[in-house]
Amino acid sequence: MRLIDLGVTPLIIEREPFPRYHIGESMTGECGGLLRDLGLGDRMLEVGHPIKHGVNVYGTRGNKDWWVPVMQRLPDGSMKEQFTWQVRRSDFDAMMLDEATSRGAEKLDARATAPLVGDDGEIRGVTATTHDERTIEIEAPLTLDCTGQASFLANKKATGPKYLGAYDKQIAVFSQISNFRRDNGEDRADQPDNTHIFYTKKYHWAWAIPIDDQVTSVGIVIPAEYFREKGEQKTDFLRRELHDLNPGLSGRIDGEPVFVEGAHVIPNYSFQVRKFAGPGYMCVGDSHRFIDPIFSFGLYVAMKEAGLAANAAVKYLAGEGRGTDDPFHDYMVGVEMAIDRIEDLVDAFWENPLAFAVMTHRKFRNGTIDNLAGRFFDDHGCPMEERDAATAAFRKLLGRDRSYDESGLYSMPIGSRFHPERAPLWNSNLDSIATTEAWMRDLD
């Protein structure tokens, strides 16, 4: 939609029909702002997506240890109460695709199989297989990879190498239930459709996200080894964890959880792609970097980067940077520095949740609200001193100094997340998997 607004007609290649299943999503405050900027705020209200006023985080005793409200940062630096939405992704994604095509985007039902690479090494489009098994070549001056964790271009080795991150041995087990008891108070923290996060120990937590007026998405994120040790079927595992993980969670489910679908399992590993934009291509969102889903940044990052990529793409198509090895330098640097802020916040939470809670409640409340809202990119047009102070505090807590390589293109991930001697992760078996969703689906 951003490209269309800027006078460019994109061709969207979709391998699977819509609507299609996707895990439910909690939007950040800035994600809601992007939808309003696209003129879709009224549409979101008309459709009836649950309204999110913020996030309640529960400590090990089951108490609401801290509350993060959705707040809008105004140009003068002040904050204003705002709201965003929870969405059932199958419905939301279908709405966004319909909106894009109604505004002028073209859509092709096909499966991209390989990038087209010119003699000079520049990507010039993709080879695709249509639903009637015809192989076609689609040439384009610019290819945008928006395939999410399937990482089409990285897995085809068209980018720099793809490295595993810190959260490379976790999985999420999730489903939907109809008997999660919601709040119904007057305060914003007690509104019925807020997000709830339940913590029990490092890398072991649960979510509850209302996705309509009856159904709540619930899920457990745990180390994969813990899941294997239990030796339980997915649904049995999830049922027990909903009862055992945190008293704040079990206290909101009357009796046994009433599942409205079966349980699902997906890998939850983090990764980082080097050189994720170059001559003829750009990677957007999870297709080049993924950290941890605990604070629901994924959808916002995808939409935010899409806007930044659209601006850079228009300049490139007009000739700016064409013929150079590094036409998207500013895009990559801006994105890397923003995602670094996410990584530092998430790592601080996991490494020292008590100190994190104290910092967010007392010294750096507004700065943490900025980060959790999604204001970690540097183009908000309002003061970000409080955000930067919070980020500096998280890095100090971690004993971390952020450094960048000599070209200024990439952050250098810290500690165990990056070893020069470690071979890059190439998920080169992607061709043998029927669909993106199948790749993300059940492990057993």
Language-model features, listed with the residues they occupy:
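Glycine-rich FAD pyrophosphate-binding loop
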Residues: 4-23
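Helix-loop-beta segment of a Rossmann-like dinucleotide-binding subdomain
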Residues: 65-87, 125, 221-225
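Mobile, glycine/GP-rich and aromatic-enriched active-site lid/loop segments adjacent to catalytic centers
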Residues: 67, 199-203, 209-273, 278-279, ...
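C-terminal helical "tail/cap" subdomain of flavin- and related membrane-associated enzymes
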Residues: 314-444
